[in-house]
């Protein structure tokens, strides 16, 4: 049996190294895609923290929140209906 030529050994080592580099590059590309999904996470966490702090303040009575505009007209309408019913001497069924 003859020994493998030095150039053949070098070629085999380079081929094996190239295969390993390709595998690592594929893994890195996958990680890069995963990190891109996390780009907006700090802003989302900050927003969530702010909302949680506001909720905690409301629950402890530190602040009283303003009602959303979508609820204000309904409350005015309901108050008007209750007032009208009271003037007519009717009991509210609400």
Curated annotation (Swiss-Prot):
Lipid metabolism as a keyword of this entry, yes or no, is no
Query: What's in the keyword line of the UniProt record?
Result: Host cytoplasm, Host nucleus, Late protein, Viral occlusion body
Q: Write out the annotated subcellular location.
A: Host cytoplasm; Host nucleus
| Any single Gene Ontology cellular-component annotation | viral occlusion body
Matches recorded under Pfam families? NPV_P10
Which superkingdom, per the lineage? Viruses
The record lists its disulfide bonds as none
Q: Does the keyword Transcription apply?
A: no
Q: Which InterPro entries match?
A: NPV_P10 (IPR008702)
Described by its record, this protein's role is as follows: Plays a role in the proper virion occlusion of the polyhedra. Forms extensive fibrillar structures in both host nucleus and cytoplasm. Involved in the liberation of polyhedra from infected insect cells.
* Protein name as catalogued: Protein p10
Q: Which organism is it from?
A: Autographa californica nuclear polyhedrosis virus (AcMNPV)
């Amino acid at each position: 049996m003859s020994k493998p030529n030095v150039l053949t050994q070098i070629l085999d080592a380079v081929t094996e190294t190239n295969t390993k580099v390709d595998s690592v590059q594929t893994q890195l590309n996958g990680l890069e895609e995963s990190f891109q999904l996390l780009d907006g996470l700090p802003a989302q966490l900050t927003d969530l923290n702010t909302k949680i702090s506001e909720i905690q303040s409301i629950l402890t009575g530190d602040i009283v929140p303003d009602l959303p505009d979508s609820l204000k007209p309904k409350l005015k309408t309901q108050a008007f209906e209750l007032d009208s019913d009271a003037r007519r001497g009717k009991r509210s069924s609400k």
